[in-house]
Amino acid sequence: MSQASTTTLESGALLSGPRGLQYGSPAHRKEKAAAMPDSPAEVKTQPRSTPPSMPPPPPTSSQGATRPPSFTPHTHGEDGPATSLPHGRFHGCLKWSMVCLLMNGSSHSPTAIHGAPSTPNGFSNGPATSSTASLSTQHLPPACGARQLSKLKRFLTTLQQFGSDISPEIGERVRTLVLGLVNSTLTIEEFHAKLQEATNFPLRPFVIPFLKANLPLLQRELLHCARLAKQTPAQYLAQHEQLLLDASATSPVDSSELLLEVNENGKRRTPDRTKENGSDRDPLHPDHLSKRSCTLSPAQRCSPSNGLPHPTPPPPPHYRLEDMAMAHHFRDSYRHPDPRELRERHRPLAIPGSRQEEVIDHRLTEREWAEEWKHLNSLLNCIMDMVEKTRRSLTVLRRCQEADREELNHWIRCYSDSEEGKKGPTPISARSLNSCSGPEGSQLDVHRDFTPRTLSGYMPEEIWRKAEEAVNEVKRQAMSELQKAVSDAERKAHELITTERAKMERALAEAKRQASEDALTVINQQEDSSESCWNCGRKASETCSGCNAARYCGSFCQHKDWEKHHHVCGQSLQGPAAAVADPLPGQPDATASPSEAGSAGPSRPCSPGPPGPLDAAVPR
């Protein structure tokens, strides 16, 4: 069947509306048989020809006691067939029943495994949602889960293509809704409501139970692929969107692995972990072995390109109708796998369309066991090579350390001999003893050095001790040299400081002397000046009456300066004053100056009289 016909049929099955073909009629069965040549109807022994208006046939003795299914007669002149699911349990494989539900809106499943017959073409008004949702909890074969995933992906692809046929905008909205549903951001009810709002076409009522029953399988597959790719489910879905919305693409990871998680009490088990613990070969689960008979199709079991035969092939009586239907279903999709595909079947990430939709048997074949033993043998050989290389490296390192230790002992002996030579000359007796026992003594030293090492093996403590002693000796010498250099530097610094201090003191003394000389020069200049006071240096207004040369600002400065001035005062007038005193010996001179009185009494040169009044000599 081509992709276009699949899309047309499925898009027509999704929407409820008037149908031109009568469901359950011979023409309808003829058209359906022509559309699906691989239907299990080819291998059934009792084809159904009951018209929809007849009640269901009574249960036979082989089917056991079952609940009588409710049946509502229906005519097709109204709005198409009734939109509810029949009572009863479906076929364990669930392939053709759900395909017919999606395609034609009728139940065309084979006889149920557990004995409950399904209604041929009628639809009951019972709780179809609960009965359909309970299908996901039944222990179905892994291949059935793979087919359910394939149908769900085809259903979502048909939805997206139907929206794209309406308009590109609606197709984009439908694609966003599908991605949100798979990504768990939308619930099934929200998806249903928004899809109906986007397309203005209502879906059939069995779509919601179908999604509730099969959407968790697709979400588990998405989560498993995302974990293998080390991504979040949203990231993985964004990168591999074509795997979901492309009808020709296959799943990148085998979906039977995900279904095994559901069938085995929800335990997550990857292929590697299953191979390690070997739990799938546990003989305590016979029902599990009976389920494993459905993991591979008969064509794949008998394929000559699979290498060695399966260790425990199921006997021929265990083939059932499900296996035959599966062989018909996978007749085109399965081809003989090539050895390269067998080697690469455990790779989680593959190019879309490069792998077939197959179910992997986790039990190891003899070839895989041989490869495992080969890998283990190569691993052990690598470990042995590493151990041998390590042992050789340790031997070489030990020899090098022994050579270094011998050289270190030689240098230590040379150093000790040089130290003894520095301390003083060796006594004659000791020197003769050393000369007599030269080679023998050296041999004894070597024997003494190596005897405990040969007894105790490798002793690094002595080497470290001698090396530390040599290093400490070098440190001591370096410290002594450093102390000498520091002391010399300190001595030179002190000498330099002393020299600079002496220079500074001499400079200060010279500056003080120069300052005193400058002060004396200023004083002398002030004394020579006739405009300033000889005592204080201020502007002079009076003149000494004795010498008529000294200038003072007042009588206070004159009396203050008299102790120094009386030595020079009147010397220039001493001769004329004596000549004046001779012709007038008896005349009292009321205005005689102190210099004249001093000259009159030469016997008292050191006790001059008080200075005369200034106003007598200074004109007013």
From Swiss-Prot:
Residues 49-60 have a biased composition (Pro residues). Residues 371-389 are annotated as: Nervy homology region 2 (NHR2). The keyword Coiled coil applies. A zinc finger (MYND-type) spans 533-569. Widely expressed with higher expression in heart, brain, lung and spleen. Expressed in hematopoietic cells (at protein level). Residues 1-412 are annotated as: Mediates localization to the nucleus. Residues 465-520 form a coiled coil. PROSITE patterns: TAFH, ZF_MYND_1, ZF_MYND_2. Residues 1-10, 118-139, 292-306 have a biased composition (Polar residues). Residues 590-604 have a biased composition (Low complexity). GO terms for cellular component: Golgi membrane; nucleolus; nucleoplasm. Residues 151-243 are annotated as: Interaction with HIF1A. Residues 462-483 are annotated as: Mediates interaction with PRKAR2A. InterPro entries: CBFA2T1/2/3, CBFA2T3, NHR2, TAFH/NHR1_dom_sf, TAFH_NHR1, Znf_MYND. Residues 120-217 are annotated as: Interaction with ZBTB33. Transcriptional corepressor which facilitates transcriptional repression via its association with DNA-binding transcription factors and recruitment of other corepressors and histone-modifying enzymes. Can repress the expression of MMP7 in a ZBTB33-dependent manner. Reduces the protein levels and stability of the transcriptinal regulator HIF1A; interacts with EGLN1 and promotes the HIF1A prolyl hydroxylation-dependent ubiquitination and proteasomal degradation pathway. Heterodimer with RUNX1T1 and CBFA2T2. Interacts with ZNF652 and ERBB4. May interact with PRKAR2A, PDE7A and probably PDE4A. Interacts with PLXNA1, PLXNA3 and PRKAR1A. Interacts with HDAC1, HDAC2, HDAC3, HDAC6, HDAC8, NCOR1 and NCOR2. Component of a TAL-1 complex composed at least of CBFA2T3, LDB1, TAL1 and TCF3. Interacts with ZBTB4, ZBTB38 and ZBTB33. Interacts with HIF1A and EGLN1. This is Protein CBFA2T3. It comes from Mus musculus (Mouse). The lineage of its organism: Eukaryota, Metazoa, Chordata, Craniata, Vertebrata.
